[in-house]
Amino acid sequence: RNYERGRQAFVDAQCLACHRFGREGGGVGPDLTAVSSRFARRDLLESIVEPSKVLSQQFENTTVTLKDGESITGRLVEETPETLVLLPNPLQPDAKIRVEKKKVASKSASKISPMPTNLVDGLSREEILDLLAFIESSGRRQHPSFQQ
């Protein structure tokens, strides 16, 4: 596997926008540091290419259906007795939607992952495998995955 290509794929797929990795990254998604100690390679790959297949309650989105029939899905980032605040796109943290509770017909857990499904669409099979090796290595160039 190729370390540089894996690191670049990690950047290109915008992983750090949502995921913590070492001392960098966001906190919207699961921490990817040492994730290979908790999950098998197949599960990691599946989570990258099919993020909605297995959802963690800790990171699930909420779907709010309004009385007028409109639905809004996003991460519930704030709730008061009067309002709900949703973040529909974790890559746009300033685009929060405030909803008055009196306008809400229902609120439920979404079955769709907040991780977009198309983040690796521009990557080749080899780049995806290098990305997987980079994540498994916790970003360490000396990891056995990168030794010839």
Q: What annotation goes with each model-predicted range?
A:
Residues 70-72, 76-84, 97, 108, ...:
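C-terminal capping alpha-helices of c-type cytochrome domains
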Residues 35-38, 47-54, 134, 138-141:
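Conserved, well-folded catalytic cores of nucleic-acid-processing
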Residues 2-9, 60, 71-72, 129-134:
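Extended surface/linker regions that mediate inter-domain or inter-protein docking
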Residues 2, 14, 123-127:
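An acidic site on a long C-lobe helix of protein kinase domains
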Residues 6, 12-22, 32, 131-138:
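The canonical Cys-X-X-Cys-His
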Residues 1-2, 21-24, 134-148:
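Post-cleavage N-terminal segment of exported redox proteins
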Residues 25-49, 60-109:
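Gly/Gly-Pro-rich "capping" loops immediately C-terminal to redox-active cysteine motifs
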Residues 1-11, 30-33, 39-43, 67-70, ...:
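Electrostatic cytochrome c docking/interface patches
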